[in-house]
Amino acid sequence: MKITHVSIRNFRCIRELDLELGDTTVFIGPNSAGKSAIVDAIRIVLSRRWGQRGTGFTELDVYRPDEGGDPKTLPPVMIEISIEEPSAGAWDADMVAALDDIMTLSGAKNIIRLRVTCAWSAEKDAFDPLWQFLTPDGDPMTGRAQRATNLTGFFHYLPVFWLGALRDAADEFHSRGSWGRLLKDVRIPKELEEEVLKTLAELDAKVIAADEKLTKIAEQIGHSTHVAIGDSPGSARLNMLPVAIEDMLARSGVLIQNEALRPWLPLGHQGQGLQSLAVIFLFQAAVSQQLLEAESGMEALFAIEEPEVHLHPQAARALWQRVSTLTGQRIMTTHSPYFVQHVPLRDLRIVGLRGGKSVVASIPARTVSTVPWTESVSKFIAGAQLEGIFEKDPASGNIAAKSWFSAEYAEKLAGCFKGDADATTKKAEIEKLRHKCRTMPSAEDEVELGFHGRRVRGEIFFARRWLLVEGVCEHLLVHAIAKALAWPLDEHGVTVIDFQQSGNAGIYPALADAFGIPWNMIVDGDAESEKFRQQIMDRGYNEDDLKLQFTMHPKPQDLEDNLVALGHEPLLRKILAQIQGKTALTCPTAEFMARLKNKKTGYMSTLAPMVAADQVLAAKMPKAFVDLISGYKAKKP
């Protein structure tokens, strides 16, 4: 049983938010954007403790549009979760029978909807939470569904395990923490217990007998019974070792040896990164132990905040493999680009704050059209082996797409309706579907990003804007221009992506639009620019989409041609002479240009610092770069 949809209203910084959740969902974004609020909303809904003193709901959880808002009079908090069976009959039969009172049907599939609200009650003089199971129409269920045992049973089958970012190994590896709860399930055979306790008693006696001061201390303490009781004084003895197995387990701890020749040290004496990792592994062990005893049908939800805390990049990358194998549904937040590098694109949710309200962007799993799925369509899809792109939407019976598709496929789909009276209308609808799907990566795209874009993929999703350029030279130059114009790109959240080194030119505009990230692309004015433009258009973009975002240097110039046309040949000859010798100062122009283009990174590594230090020189750099950065500065994106 997994949560498929979450609806949040008037909770903390969230005014209105609807989310689709998968088996794994990773929330990323800037601080205070609402990531933890989303996790807490889900956690509170699945909590067993209700009322202001137990749920986590307080007046501070009510969304306030301004600082003068009174939580008592503002709209109430409302959190709603939907849990839909993945396919008919997929859920455990015993669980379905146990939760029958609160289940409804969506087609042939079972579905559970739970709504939690929290509003001010003048009668109770407190914020009063209310939880209700809902009908498919969103109305509260009545009758047997209102029994309190239904909520208890529901929580039993969907337990939530939360691990916050501020985890403390000292707290968790304590008898009252996860460590203690894990040890409570330890069972030692009675014969072994008796043998251990006998051995401990003998060792205890030897330790005390080793120094007569210990015996005298015990005798002195024993006098306290005479003062307290009076008539029949007792005695006291020192206990140096545990007297019961429970005591021994309670005193247990963890020692770690980092390398074979290093000493064994307590966990508390290790670094913060190792302690944080240890807590995660303890969390996994404790939950796994608990789930071993779970009934059939129970499926846990893991809510983990910033699993990468204190870890170095390689460890953060490796950690994804660990947490992604947790059995159940996984919801995580992270600020680590290294952790994000391995997260599948469709598992990412980018959280932002706009106008004081949280917004979330993601890649849709599929897009449904208004065009019906016919026998002709089915034959075309099967014959062309396009099941990975198209499918029939079971709810509407229409064509649904799972990734972008080419104009050729759109034309052939339209051909399936060429004899229909409304063939023109259906062709237009297919074109609309293609345009909507332009932001959805294919399986090949994900592989390409994983291979080419690993070095930038994690970082780019934390940026406020993407600037796409062809290569390393452009990357260095735009950073230098921005610095000279007193508007450093990194400080303003602009990531520069040299897309030729990191995948197909069409992938990044599509991803940017899917995640709501503004983008611009600047390319050379040569023949290659048309190839890049076409790669974007092939995904379903149109001319209007690219009008303000795709810019070229003057045709037919590439970057070096443009720099020379702007009058920088003398400066570039001097730079090239430092690299290749004085012949660069006097060689023919054609030879000079060939040599310059053959030493792109070499000349730019010298030119870029000069540009960064000279605002006048920066203003004379290629117009496309200067105008764009000046525009950024004026708009302050």
Task: List PLM regions with ranges.
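Acidic, divalent-metal-binding catalytic cores of TOPRIM
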Residues: 354-637
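Short alpha-helical segments and helix-capping/turn motifs at coil-helix boundaries
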Residues: 61-67, 99-102, 138-150, 238-240, ...
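Electropositive, glycine-dotted interaction segments
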Residues: 86-195
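Extended helical coiled-coil dimerization/tether regions that scaffold
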Residues: 169, 174, 182-304, 395
